[in-house]
Each structure stands twice: as C-alpha cells, then as structure tokens.
Amino acid sequence: MRLTASAIAEQFGLTVVGDGTTEVSGVATLAHAGAGQLSFLSNPRYRPQLADTQAAVVVLRADDAEAAKGTALVAKDPYTAFAKIAALFDLAPVREPGIHASAVIDPTAQVSATAHVGPFVSIGARSRVGDGCVIGTGSIIGEDCVVDAGSELLARVTLVTRVRLGKRVRIHPGAVIGADGFGLAMDAGHWIKVPQLGGVVIGDDCEIGANTCIDRGALEDTVLEEDVRVDNLVQIAHNCRIGAHSAIAGCTGIAGSAKIGRYCLLGGHVGVVGHLEICDKVVITGKSVVRNSIHEPGEYSSGTPLTDNRTWRKNAARFKQLDVLARRILAVGKEKE
C-alpha cells in the first residue's frame, strides 16, 4: 500500500510542509528509515537525526519543521499521530469465521457464526463468544465466561472461569485471567484455602500483555475499567480495581483489594501494597513501592537511581548509619541548649 503525504494529512488533520505528493509505503525510525518510508520526531534528543534521515516523510511539531530536509507532516502530538498512521500499515492476518475441527466446545456454549475459533481451543459450559471474536490456537475459555464482540485472544490465553471481557479486548499469549486469588487463612498452624467465589470483569478496549495474571475476586469481582492497558508479566491480585485509561508497565505487582484510579501510569517493576487507594491521574515511577494510599494527583517515586558501584556502596553504608547519626545530632543540639 502506498499513500501520499497529502492523503495522510487529510485523514488525520495534519499540515503538510513540502511536497504533498510524496508517497510512503511503510514506517521506520529516523535512524533506519529509507526511501518511501515515514518516520516521526517527538523526543528532542533525536532532533539531530533529522539532518541525516532518509525518511521520505517525517511527522513532527511545528517548531521542528524547518529542520526537516524533506516532506514533513506537522502535528500537535507527533507520537500519537504516528501511532495512528502506523496502524494503516499494520496488515494483520485476516481470520476467517469458523471453528477449527480440533476445537472442543461444550454443547451449552454459544459461539457467534462470525467468530474465528482456532486449533486446539477449548470452550467450557455456558460460555459465550461474540461477533467477530478471534480465539487463538490453544486458548482455553472455562465455564461461565463471556467474550464480547470484536475481542481477540491470541495463542494460549486462559480464561479460567467467571471472566467477562468487554468489546474489542485484546489479550496476548500466555496470559491467565480468572485464576484463584491468593486467599489463605491460618488454622491450627496450617493454611486453609479461602474459596475465590468472584470473577473478573474487563471493560471495553482493554489490552492485556503476554504472561500477565489477573486473579478473580474472593467475593466481589476483580475489575479493569475501559481502556486499561497492561504490559507483560504483570500480577493483578484478587479484588483489585483499575480505573479507566490507566496503563501498567511490565513486572508490576498489585496486591489484593488495591484500588487504582483513572488515568494513572505505573512504571516497570512497581509494587503496590494491598487494601490501599490511589486517586486519579497519579504517575508512579519505575521500581517504586507504594505502601500508603495516595490522595493527590502527581508523580511519585521511591526507587534509587543508578550510580556507579563504588558510590552506591558508600551511600548504602551511610544509609545504615542514618539513625545513629540523627541521634548524635539531636544529642549535640540538646547539649548546646
């Protein structure tokens, strides 16, 4: 597929600077783009690459347009504009409606005639798969699950039981949704299992990364509201609620019954203690541990920035002495009084 700069600009409300008849047939980074490819500039650190890029068209801000040596498309937010343009060239394989001969479907399950059910899929009792859904190879849909219209489970996704997916949900390989929450009680020196009687509800337009686990609730449902984006290898425990339009980066763990607000961003390897609340529009930077509820929007951090090993060892040794040093300072202050 080939598109002119003018056609792209018209479709996405951009402004052409240069030759609007320039054609592109793909996308690439500034450093690796070649003839006939479109790229973008959103981070100022890559601005020097404009002088050398071979990209036919570059999406950028108005104040960077003069530095572009070829055709430019001016956007208020170049990265978002690029994401929309790149989708035009993302030619995903077409999945024809139908049920593969190797699939095993319970007689009480309902599968839309327009859905695609791939090889070695299992669909349990009373579950429903909606119009235009794609159920990838080896995926398992347990009992009493709902997969609403336009949703896609890639290979080896497991919906254990009582999982309800909204419309246009996309779940990547290896994810497990609706497994038992980690509910235990100590009885006479031995653990006993607390039954997990709730489910999982995932709203419209959510995306769940590979090998992520979202446990079902103990009594109430674990809930992801609409347009939540979850990266790979994330653990969301039972009874959590993730607010709409929030994004959670890889290797983050959220303990049970935590409540995350709307439009929140959690960086990689964040830990969230259970039974707390984070308000809307909070950013948690990578490696942070959230031990208390957050009631004010803003950016929060608790991780230690990288430094050379020698400096880190000195700082770590001094950190261990903080309490002793603080007591000495207080003692000196009292002596002077």
UniProtKB/Swiss-Prot annotation:
Disulfide bonds: none
Pathway where it operates: Bacterial outer membrane biogenesis; LPS lipid A biosynthesis
UniProt keywords, alphabetically: Acyltransferase, Lipid A biosynthesis, Lipid biosynthesis, Lipid metabolism, Repeat, Transferase
One Pfam family of this chain: Hexapep_2
A GO BP annotation: lipid A biosynthetic process
NCBIfam families registered for this protein in UniProt: lipid_A_lpxD, PRK00892.1
UniProt family annotation: Belongs to the transferase hexapeptide repeat family. LpxD subfamily.
Protein's name in the database: UDP-3-O-acylglucosamine N-acyltransferase
